[in-house]
């Protein structure tokens, strides 16, 4: 279940989280992951074959999202403290940036933090297992792992070409520090 952390407020109620994110133009849902995947998802890392097994086990979700949102492809990203180059990888996304295509994540294990500056307001969304978030194109955000240093997320794409981060000067978008 996602948690919103703002300057002087924390929102944990599922309905309030969804309402707040909807108001900010983000899509948030909470989906249960199939219990049949629990054993494999409990592993720290996954081989390519295991990633394919997980994606196959979630094919029903992809089919739903293709119909609802027009996604054409998906993949599974597995990040943890033993991934070679993890610090450099995270450094690409822990600074304020946008993408020219929407960013869509379904968290199936672990946890992380998406940060946003929308309408001049800074807030964080702490995501965990079962959280689905869609960030519209050109939305100021950043991402980092939390203290667990572990996340598995299915990424959904309409077009892979919009995935280069375009960095944003925070001082030009932050009004309500």
UniProtKB/Swiss-Prot annotation:
SUPFAM superfamilies: RmlC-like cupins. Transmembrane segments: none annotated. Its cofactor is Fe(2+); Ni(2+). It is an enzyme of class 1 (oxidoreductase). Pathway: Amino-acid biosynthesis; L-methionine biosynthesis via salvage pathway; L-methionine from S-methyl-5-thio-alpha-D-ribose 1-phosphate: step 5/6. Fe(2+) binds at residues 97, 99, 103, 141. Belongs to the acireductone dioxygenase (ARD) family. This is Acireductone dioxygenase. It comes from Leptospira biflexa serovar Patoc (strain Patoc 1 / ATCC 23582 / Paris).
């Amino acid at each position: 279940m996602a948690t919103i952390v703002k300057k002087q407020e924390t929102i944990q109620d599922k309905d309030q989280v969804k309402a707040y994110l909807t108001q900010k133009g983000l899509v948030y849902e909470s989906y249960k992951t199939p219990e049949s995947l629990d054993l494999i998802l409990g592993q720290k890392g996954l081989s390519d074959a295991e990633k394919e097994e997980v994606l196959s086990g979630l094919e029903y979700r992809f089919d739903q999202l293709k119909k609802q949102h027009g996604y054409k492809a998906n993949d599974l990203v597995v990040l943890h403290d033993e991934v070679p180059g993890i610090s450099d990888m995270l450094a690409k996304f822990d600074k304020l940036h946008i993408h020219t295509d929407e960013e869509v994540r379904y968290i199936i294990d672990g946890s992380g933090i998406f940060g946003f500056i929308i309408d001049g307001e800074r807030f964080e969304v702490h995501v965990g297992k079962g959280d689905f978030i869609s960030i519209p194109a050109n939305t100021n955000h950043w991402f980092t792992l939390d203290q667990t240093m572990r996340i598995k997320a299915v990424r959904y794409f309409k077009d892979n070409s919009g995935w280069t981060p375009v960095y944003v000067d925070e001082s030009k978008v932050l009004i309500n520090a």
